Amino acid sequence: MNAVWIDEAPVAGAATNSLKIERETHKLEKRLCREVGRAIVDYNMIEEGDKVMVCVSGGKDSYAMLDILLKLRARAPIHFDIVAVNLDQKQPGFPEEVLPRYLSELGVDFHIENQDTYSIVKRVIPEGKTTCGLCSRLRRGILYRVADELGATKVALGHHRDDMLQTFFLNMFFAGKLKSMPPKLVSDDGKHIVIRPLAYVAEKDLVRWAQHREFPIIPCTLCGSQENLQRKQVGEMLREWDRKHLGRVENMFTALQNVVPSHLLDGTQHDFKGLKATGVADEDGDKAFDTPSFDLLSQAPAALRILQG
């Protein structure tokens, strides 16, 4: 009898690798649910009896937002409804069958709104000029109308942590403002509450989750406007910092939640003109002649690298 020897090492290695991937994916899911849940609680985004209109574009962010919200709804201590909405703007090449098929298979209530805003923008905006302003206004108006028609009490958008930081830098670099994307706001028509449940979520986690879930991603056919080019450049800057300087992006995002108006220059946010010496010592008062100190410097070598980078 001939003996056949089988090397079991590759099989064992594959099994170990599979278990590792499964564990990492489980950790990722827990982190996404935790961060979305924390944002919802911190900003009171969703309340008892809400009907949340989840805007789904076909990109990884909106797919992930819908996915995580459905998971959270299943175990939430309150009741709320979800309806997924896609605005088909009739851009050339948009695969209109993808989202209805996916949402039907998912079993979620959904609505596809067909509006040819693409032709309107092309007709009104001269060739070579930016289309962002008009396109955005048209899209907003349509989605707010649909929210009214569906009886939605909240409109959920899929902007994440990196989008908020990109917007902060775009406003600072090109508009001279310290302004980002709020996690929750009242719409410009005064009738709707808009929420961003992914406010605490890093884009790199959404990329991994989309790969794991195999969402049917619809390629984004951007118009190539200057604003989008600038956003891409700022996004690459943030990714480069994230690669080279551990903790920098997290610290910047934390800074958006720790604003000190008295140490900026906006007189509408702090009464500099009315300041008077009271003669009473303040332990938290500014030490004007001292060099600012950063607690992080004494706590972590990585922070020192962040500041020096």
UniProtKB/Swiss-Prot annotation:
GO terms for cellular component: cytoplasm. Its EC number is 2.8.1.-. Keywords: 4Fe-4S, ATP-binding, Cytoplasm, Iron, Iron-sulfur, Magnesium, Metal-binding, Nucleotide-binding, RNA-binding, Transferase, tRNA processing, tRNA-binding. It is an enzyme of class 2 (transferase). Its main location: cytoplasm. Pathway: tRNA modification. GO terms for biological process: tRNA thio-modification. InterPro entries: Rossmann-like_a/b/a_fold, TilS/TtcA_N, tRNA_Cyd_32_2_STrfase, tRNA_thiolation_TtcA_Ctu1. [4Fe-4S] cluster binds at residues 132, 135, 223. It is found in: Cytoplasm. Its cofactor is Mg(2+); [4Fe-4S] cluster. A motif (PP-loop motif) lies at residues 57-62. Binds 1 [4Fe-4S] cluster per subunit. The cluster is chelated by three Cys residues, the fourth Fe has a free coordination site that may bind a sulfur atom transferred from the persulfide of IscS. GO terms for molecular function: 4 iron, 4 sulfur cluster binding; ATP binding; magnesium ion binding; sulfurtransferase activity; tRNA binding. It holds the Pfam family ATP_bind_3. It catalyses: cytidine(32) in tRNA + S-sulfanyl-L-cysteinyl-[cysteine desulfurase] + AH2 + ATP = 2-thiocytidine(32) in tRNA + L-cysteinyl-[cysteine desulfurase] + A + AMP + diphosphate + H(+). The thiolation reaction likely consists of two steps: a first activation step by ATP to form an adenylated intermediate of the target base of tRNA, and a second nucleophilic substitution step of the sulfur (S) atom supplied by the hydrosulfide attached to the Fe-S cluster. Homodimer. PANTHER family: AMINOTRAN_5 DOMAIN-CONTAINING PROTEIN, SULFURTRANSFERASE-RELATED. Catalyzes the ATP-dependent 2-thiolation of cytidine in position 32 of tRNA, to form 2-thiocytidine (s(2)C32). The sulfur atoms are provided by the cysteine/cysteine desulfurase (IscS) system. HAMAP family: TtcA. Belongs to the TtcA family. This is tRNA-cytidine(32) 2-sulfurtransferase.
